[in-house]
Amino acid sequence: MTAAATFRFLTPMPRLGSGAGPGGDAARWAAELRRIEDLGFHAVAVSEHYSRGWTMDALTAMNFALASTTRLRVMPLVLNNDLHHPAILAKAIATADVLSGGRAAVGIGAGWLADDYRALGADYAAAPVRIDRLTEASQIITTFFTGRPVTFGGRHYRLDGLEALPRPVQDPRPPVLVGGGGPRMLALAGSLADIAGVHARLGPGGFDARAAKGLSRASVNRKISLVAAAASKAGRPAPAIQFTCYDVNVAGVQVTPIRPLFSDFIDAHPASFADSPTSLRGEIGKCVEDLQRWRDELGISYWNLGGNLDAIAPIVARLSAE
C-alpha cells in the first residue's frame, strides 16, 4: 500500500498595509512572514496581477519573503507566462533558490484575467495560443534547471546555447507547478510538472458559472484523473496535487470571503458539493478529518486554505506533521 502524501499547507502572501514611517510596511511584513513560518506552513503563495487593486510585484515579493525567513518556502501561485520570458524567469528562480538555500519554487499559468492584459496594453491571445506559449516556456524552464545549455526552436521562443546558470540548489530542481482548470492545462501539468495546481477553469473575467460547476466533487475527480493520465502517458510519476479551497469556514469563522455566485451555485446543487474539497466547513476536528479523507481519496497534498492564520493554524498544527 502506498503511503499517504505529506500535507503541505500554503497561505497567501501578506498584503502590504500602511506602516508608519520609512520601512514600516517592510518590518511588519517580515514579522508576519516569520509568524507564518513559525506556525508550520510549508510555503507562502505569491500571486501576480496588474489590475483590481493588486499591489505587489510577484518576484520582488518572493525574494523579500525568502530573505526574511529561514525555513519557509515561496511558491508563485501563479505567474502569468505571457509576462515573462521563460529563460529570464528560470534564471531568476534559480538565483533565488541558490541565495535562499533551496527554498524557491516556480508556479506558472497561461494567464486568464483580461483586465491585466488590457491595463498593460498586452495582446490577450486566444486560450489555445496562450497554452501553446506556456507549453514551450515550461519545457525551457525545466531544461534550464538541469544546468545544461538550452537550445530551443519553437514557434514562440528560440534559444541558442543559453548557459543555464546558476544551477539550482534543490535536487533535481526547484519544484515546478503548472496551474489550471481545463483539459490541456491539466495534461500539461501531468506531463512535466512536479505539482499540478488543480483549479476552476477561469474565463477572461474570472469566476463565473462554468468555474463554479467545475469545482464539484465529480469535476475535481475528473481533473485529477486527467493529470494522472497525462503523467502515465509521459512515462513519469503523477505530480503532487495542489488545491485551493474557495469556501473555508472553521468553527464559525469565515476564513475566505465566499463569492456570491459560488455560494448561489452550491445552494442550487447541494448534492454535487456535499463532499467537494472546494468547501471546508465545520469544527477543527471535522475539518481535519475532511482534509485527511480528501488527501487519501483524491491525492491532494498541497492545500491553500486562505490567509486567516488564527483560524487555520490549529488545522496546520494537527496535519503538517502527517
Residue positions per predicted region:
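Active-site-adjacent structural elements that line small-molecule/cofactor binding pockets in enzymes
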Residues: 1-322
